Every structure is written in C-alpha cells, then in structure tokens.
C-alpha cells in the first residue's frame, strides 16, 4: 500500500476470498471491482493466484503475485510529488446494503483522518493496537494500519477469518 502511494499509484485494497462464499462468487466480485477501478496491475498473494488471474483476465488487466513483483529489478524513475488534493487511494464500501462502491480518498482527506485519530485517541509511542479488521475495510486500513504508522504505534494483527470463526481463542 505505502509503496504504491509513494510511487504515485492508487492502491485499491480489495477483500480476500473468505468473505464471498465460494471461488466463483469471489472471481465474479473481484472482476466487477477490477472493472470499476480500471487498474493497470492487480497484485495478489500467491495463495489466490488462480482466482486473481481469472478475474484479471476477464477485465484485460495484468496480474502478478506480490512475491513475483517483489523480485523484479527496481527501475530508475523520478517519483511524482503528490499534491494534497490528488487521489491517494480508492476504498470500496463493504457492499452490505448494495454493491460495493469505490470512493476516491485524497491525500488531504487521509491526513485529516489520521490527525483526527491522533488527537481524539491521544495516541502515543507507548500505545499498542490489536486488530482483526481486514485492511480493505476503512477502519482496518486507516484506523488500525495507517494511523499506527503515522503515530508510530505498535500493532498486532490477527487473521480476520480466524478471529471471526473463534473470537475468544
């Protein structure tokens, strides 16, 4: 996520298959989100390679595992300078009341949100966060990942599907 923003790309955090009840449903959902976000490249964890490749192929989108992408030689490029009103990332709604909708979040909006977290939660470097929220979810991404980075707070993360199945384990 951070590397995409740094490079001037718009990361689009998308859910993993555990939330859709089956391989075909996940491929369908992912293909629709790819169509609406029109990415240049879909990066995915190797364990969902077959589903990610199928969804990307439907949309004519390049796809590569994070692991393969990380092995690429870094090109020599000049990184873009972001302006406050440039888009920072795309965030999809959960789709609990209708189909997930993509929302463009600017750098300014994200920084205001992070500032609000720091001020209202009085975060300090001795604080620690434990979260099971997935990073494609707004509270998981902003509240439990980016806010921790911005405020130098330590975090421990539980796998969302494992926590949902056995929250007291």
Q: Model regions: which residues?
A:
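Active-site segment of SDR-like NAD(P)-dependent oxidoreductases
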Residues: 94-97, 133-139, 161
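Structural core segment of the AMP-binding/adenylate-forming
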Residues: 6-73, 80
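Conserved pre-ATP/AMP-binding loop-to-beta segment of ANL
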Residues: 63, 73-92, 98-99, 113, ...
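Conserved AMP-binding/adenylation subdomain of ANL enzymes
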Residues: 111-128, 138-169
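Short catalytic-loop micro-motif centered on adjacent basic/acidic residues
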Residues: 13, 42-43, 130-131, 156-158
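Conserved coil-to-alpha-helix start sites within the AMP-binding
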Residues: 1-6, 24-28, 133-150, 168
């Amino acid at each position: 996520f951070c590397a995409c923003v740094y490079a001037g790309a718009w990361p689009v955090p998308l859910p993993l298959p555990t939330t859709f009840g089956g391989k075909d449903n996940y491929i369908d959902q992912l293909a629709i989100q790819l169509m609406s976000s029109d990415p240049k490249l879909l990066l995915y964890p190797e364990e969902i390679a077959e589903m990610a490749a199928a969804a990307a192929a439907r949309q004519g989108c390049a796809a590569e595992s994070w692991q393969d992408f990380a092995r690429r030689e870094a090109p020599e490029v000049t990184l873009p300078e972001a302006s406050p009103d440039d888009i920072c990332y795309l965030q999809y709604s959960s789709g609990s009341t209708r189909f997930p909708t993509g929302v463009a979040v600017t750098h300014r909006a994200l920084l205001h949100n992070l500032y609000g977290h720091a001020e209202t939660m009085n975060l300090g470097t001795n604080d620690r966060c434990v979260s099971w929220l997935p990073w494609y979810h707004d509270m998981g991404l902003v509240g439990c990942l980016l806010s921790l980075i911005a405020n130098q707070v330590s975090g421990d993360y539980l796998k969302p599907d494992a926590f949902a199945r056995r929250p007291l384990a």
